[in-house]
Amino acid sequence: MSVKASGGSSLARPQLYQTVPVSAISQAEQQDRFLEGSELNELTAYFQSGALRLEIAETLTQNADLIVSRAANRIFTGGSPLSYLEKPVERQPALVGASSDSRNGSVTYAESNGSGGLFGGLRSVFSSTGPIPPGFRPINIARYGPSNMQKSLRDMSWFLRYTTYAIVAGDPNIIVVNTRGLKEVIENACSIDATIVAIQEMRAASADYFRNNAQAKEIVLQYFDILLSEFKAPTPANKVRQGPSNDIQGLELPQSYFNAAAKRQKYAMKPGLSALEKNAVIKAAYRQIFERDITKAYSQSISYLESQVRNGDISMKEFVRRLAKSPLYRKQFFEPFINSRALELAFRHILGRGPSSREEVQKYFSIVSSGGLPALVDALVDSQEYADYFGEETVPYLRGLGVEAQECRNWGMQQDLFSYSAPFRKVPQFITTFAQYDRPLPDQHVYGSGNDPLEIQFGAIFPKETRNPSKRPAPFNKDTKRILIHRGPAVNNQVGNPSAVGEFPGSLGAKVFRLNGGLPGAKVGKNTGTSVKFGESSTQALIRAAYRQVFGRDLYEGQRLSVAEIQLENGDISVREFIKRLAKSELFLKLYWAPHYVCKAIEYMHRRLLGRPTYGRQEMNQYFDIASKQGFYAVVEAMIDSKEYSDAFGEDTVPYERYLTPGGLQMRSARVGSLREDIGQRVDKEVTPRFVELGQVSAIRTEPEIAYRSNQGVTRQRQQTKVFKLVSTYDKVAVKNAIRAAYRQVFERDLEPYIINSEFTALESKLSNNEINVKEFIEGLGTSELYMKEFYAPYPNTKVIEMGTKHFLGRAPLNQKEIQQYNQILASQGLKAFIGAMVNGMEYLQTFGEDTVPYRRFPTLPAANFPNTERLYNKLTKQDKELVVPSFTPVVKVGG
């Protein structure tokens, strides 16, 4: 798969923390029910305490500096810690109506509560803030440094601020998500014990402001206790995505992301559950498999399966299998779709995710094509992944954002698959996207094909994703430039000939309307835009052309800009200024900016005002930035005041269509009545067959050259090689021949009888009695003392590896990587392990099997292996110790 592949850019908003209302509503929404009594009581208690929680947060916010200062004075010595606290920049609107008196009043309020002043300081000395860690030592400010002081004060202010967030949210989840795991981070820069003491001091200081309100004090202490416990807790391990396949990305999800996401309740059918709990589990299975509670929505159920799973006759895994094989599932999610789309939906319902890779789609597509829906369901339910995630009792659930790490290569398609509208999309998404990874970039807008309007005169008509989904993610990067077709002479395109931007297209392009009387292609000066040499009729023709270019049609009388038309006719404004006023009009804003997404609006405006589609991301991002910071009118000015507009149209020319996309040209050319005679006609070129060209000799060759060429390549020795294959041990002659061939292959000579009798008699008898096969006989020869004495002891490891591949694989080593692999085995485990790795390897089994004696194989791939094998076989075994496959070729031969 290409590393530049794109899985789409579907918008996903991960949940950063949980609140009481969101958690309660999310659980009810997942279970497709109304809020229960306990949840309503929880919400009632939360909203009743809302005023108190806001009061607590406001008090802590107003006295944040004093609280942080008290904590800093507790752990720092030798200076004023509060001077290092950098306050966040406040926006100006937030200061409207505020004054210095109100800020002074907040300080007075803090002191009146007994937390400030002399007595407050004495009280903080004698009050107990909690157990002090034994390793705590005050930190000297001078040695700690200004930079570290700023970071420490910032962190203490951060702890207090997030505590107020959690108090207002009514859920400590925001503290859990953002605090757990900070212990290891702060430990590298500061003392953990000092941080704990500072949090305890802030806890005591915050509680002092609510001594007269027991309920508020209890809330403050509760959330600070959670802050302390979460800070002391070790960093949780990441959630690793499970999967047995080699083509699935091994991804990890930080535990903080998992804690922040909406909790997805998991249901499991256990024997001890009550009847109501079992009904809830069955409904969860219906919601997962059929994407809705069919009992509630359609008054349908599969009663005999429900009774079996309730009574424990079948497991939840078997219940899911039978639901997916039911006629109801087949009718809704299999028959209306082609196999690839039905496969995607089955992944969503049974495994809770979309297909992960192209290989996975191909594997299960083959299953569903050959065995239908039952085979697909069995393959998914019986998979190792299903067993790891759900087992026998758990109902499958959606493993989406926040539940586990998501893959980038199927990001957009998987987010669409999790939506409720997924069954209404008939076009398969995963296989089409995976197939485009290794193809050229498509002819479409860089931010999706849905941003390309139909290239017609009337209005901005964009394809709708709800009717005919056509969006395809494509890996357009910032350096990609879209190919456009110039409407005019090809030599005048602005990419290859930038100086010809102002040249008019003539008869090959659109009709050009100008206000002055110059000839087409004449150089336009700065003051030629106000010429009124034409009469009223020609000026009105230019105005109509301007309306059609900007708006795509003629306007009604009440919609026309009469004042701007009069100024243009009188020469008060130029055509360029007139176009700018049209584009800034309220009608244009309502028609082509407000109803559309910013990307579509910019694309349409660019085609109308500059006469061409946008090139790529750099151009689009530039207009995006202007639109977000300055708005619609700044985008219009950026286009009309650009250098390209000045070069192409100047001050007196109405913009016209200069470039088309290939898709737009094809759409226009395919219309009835627009086909030319030279389109659609097949022209066959007479081409000489390639085999005829290759058979022709271009040069005159002499007899010595012909003889040399005929001797190139593999010799006839390969055709004359005799292969010894032991089919039956009853044929003693064949057994004897195979044994002799094995001696010649391994030892490169026939062995004397006395050597055979002393060392190999046992091996020969075992082979003759069919106790071992030829492969084991070869391995026994390689691990014998004779082989070790002849080919292992006298040579270095690299030479041993060369001779080993020659004797047991019939070739020279492939490359240095193979030599390194065998060298590691030989050095760490010895000769027997080296011989075993070759003889028991897949290459040996595929080439020789268990009953064939190894032989010279004449390998041709890789290219360097053939001459290396040739040299290895043509030289005598003990001729020299020079390597055939060296790691490098020396520049100067030493000792020559």
Swiss-Prot record:
User: Is this entry keyworded Acyltransferase?
Assistant: no
Q: Could you state what the record's PTM comment says about this protein?
A: Contains one covalently linked bilin chromophore. This protein autochromophorylates.
Instruction: Provide the protein's localization.
Output: Cellular thylakoid membrane
**CDD domains in alphabetical order:** PBP_PBS-LCM (cd12128)
**Annotated EC:** 4.-.-.-
Does this UniProt record's set of keywords contain RNA-binding?
A: no
- Give the main location: membrane
The lineage's top-level taxon is: Bacteria
User: What's a GO biological-process term for it?
Assistant: photosynthesis
Name the enzyme's class: lyase
Annotated ranges, domain PBS-linker: 247-427, 508-684, 703-881
Q: Which InterPro entries match?
A: Globin-like_sf, PBS_linker_dom, PBS_linker_sf, Phycobilisome_asu/bsu, Phycobilisome_asu/bsu_sf
Q: Which GO terms describe its molecular function?
A: lyase activity
Identify its membrane topology class: Peripheral membrane protein
Q: Which GO terms describe its cellular component?
A: phycobilisome; plasma membrane-derived thylakoid membrane
The record's section on PANTHER family has: PHYCOBILIPROTEIN APCE, PHYCOBILISOME 32.1 KDA LINKER POLYPEPTIDE, PHYCOCYANIN-ASSOCIATED, ROD 2-RELATED
Description of how the protein assembles with itself and partners = Heterodimer of ApcF (a variant beta-allophycocyanin). Phycobilisomes of this organism are composed of a two cylinder core, from which six rods radiate. The core is mainly composed of allophycocyanin alpha and beta chains and of minor components.
Report the protein name in the record: Phycobiliprotein ApcE
This protein's encoding gene: apcE
